[in-house]
Amino acid sequence: MKGPSVLAVTAVVLLLVLSALENSSGAPQRLSEKRNWTPQAMLYLKGAQGRRFLSDQSRRKELADRPPPERRNPDLELLTLPEAAALFLASLEKSQKDEGGNFDKSELLEDRLFNW
């Protein structure tokens, strides 16, 4: 008696598994379930996804055609080289005064620095 009941249970479980697999497949099984894509729908889908798939060359070209972003405030007055050097030396002197150490300025102004 145990043999036929185990066989019946196995058959029922197999039938349930197969029916679940058949119903869960993503592809339409019958002709009535197929989508009928009209040309207008296809154009809509192409337009909705078309910008997502730009080639690398067109992206590079678009980036190259754009002007570079402005990185500084255009209203700033630029310092001349002597003004920048004076500002740099003043900040060095201030840092030396804050440290209180003896600093030999001749090391900064050696002749070999100016012979390039």
From Swiss-Prot:
Superkingdom to which the source organism belongs: Eukaryota
GO BP term, example: positive regulation of transcription by RNA polymerase II
An annotated Gene Ontology molecular function: type 3 galanin receptor binding
Propeptide: 27-35, 50-116, 74-116
Region (Disordered): 52-77
Cleaved signal peptide residues: 1-26
Induction (record text): Down-regulated in omental and subcutaneous fat of obese animals.
Site, as annotated: Cleavage: R35, N36, R52, F53, R72, N73
Basic and acidic residues: compositionally biased ranges: 53-75
Compartments where found: Secreted; Secreted, Extracellular space; Cytoplasmic vesicle, Secretory vesicle
Major localisation: secreted
Modification Glutamine amide occurs at: Q49
Keyword set includes Signal: yes
Keywords: Amidation, Cleavage on pair of basic residues, Cytoplasmic vesicle, Hormone, Secreted, Signal
One GO cellular component term noted in the UniProt record for this chain: extracellular space
UniProt entry tagged with the keyword Protein biosynthesis: no
Family of this protein: Belongs to the spexin family.
Function: Plays a role as a central modulator of cardiovascular and renal function and nociception. Also plays a role in energy metabolism and storage. Inhibits adrenocortical cell proliferation with minor stimulation on corticosteroid release.
Protein name per Swiss-Prot or TrEMBL: Spexin
Species of the source: Mus musculus
Gene responsible for this protein: Spx
